[in-house]
Design a protein with these regions (language model features):
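Short acidic/histidine-rich active-site segments
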Residues: 120-125
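Alpha/beta enzyme core
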Residues: 1-119, 132-133, 137, 176-203
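C-terminal helical cap(s) of enzyme catalytic domains, especially alpha/beta-barrels
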Residues: 129-145
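Flexible C-terminal active-site loop/helix
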Residues: 143-194
């Protein structure tokens, strides 16, 4: 369960008695109720969710271990060992907030506090857009040599377990070829991998 973010200072309703200690009595022009936000509110909501949720998560505004520790201690004081979640957010400017050694151990330090599920929201979005921008720029400036450089990086990464060089095999084409071969008793002429450029050029 995700509590309010530590910066969430608005509620749509003040009906819940558990919120009343944080409600300021002020309302916005849209009708929202203003609240005193922060880690105490996050802990309070987390404790309300804890009996029912597998994981408790409060969205934070900075990668701050002491802040994370305060939330963890607040939850564990009443629910020892309760598993916590932490968003290692791409909205944080990591290098501006932490040193390289701090970043290298950030994950492990969180784990010691009980943050068992750690994730980077939108990591794929940023990786995809950065990679495609770099590829488009290389292709613009160097033509197919720019793409070939990407391909050579793929080849080198195979030693570390990268498998998407052979994109047809990677997405399961071989499986569907096998199914088709069984269904047609070996007489299919439209399987994909046999005789393909992938089979001939990528070994």
């Amino acid at each position: 369960a995700r509590t309010d973010a530590d910066a969430a200072d608005l509620l749509t309703s003040d009906i819940d008695d558990r919120d009343k200690k944080f409600v300021t009595g002020e309302r916005t022009s849209e009708g929202f109720f203003q609240v005193n936000c922060g880690v105490e509110q996050g802990i309070d909501r987390g404790l309300s969710y804890a009996p029912y949720a597998d994981l408790i998560w409060m969205e934070t505004s900075n990668p701050d271990l002491e802040y994370a520790r305060k939330f963890a201690e607040g939850i564990h004081a009443k629910f020892p060992g309760k598993m916590l979640a932490y968003n290692c957010s791409p909205s944080f400017n990591w290098a501006a907030k932490l040193t390289v050694p701090e970043m290298e151990t950030f994950r492990e330090e969180l784990a010691k506090m009980g943050y068992k599920f750690q994730f980077i929201t939108l990591a794929g979005f940023h990786a995809l857009n950065t990679a495609m921008f770099e590829l488009a720029l290389a292709y613009k400036e160097r033509g197919m040599a720019g793409y070939s450089e990407l391909q050579e990086r793929e080849f080198a990464l195979q030693a570390k377990g990268f498998r998407a060089v052979k994109h047809q095999s990677f997405v399961g084409t071989g499986y569907f070829d096998a199914v088709q071969t069984v269904v047609t008793a070996g007489n299919s002429s439209t399987t994909a991998l046999a005789g393909s450029t992938e089979a001939e050029q990528f070994h």
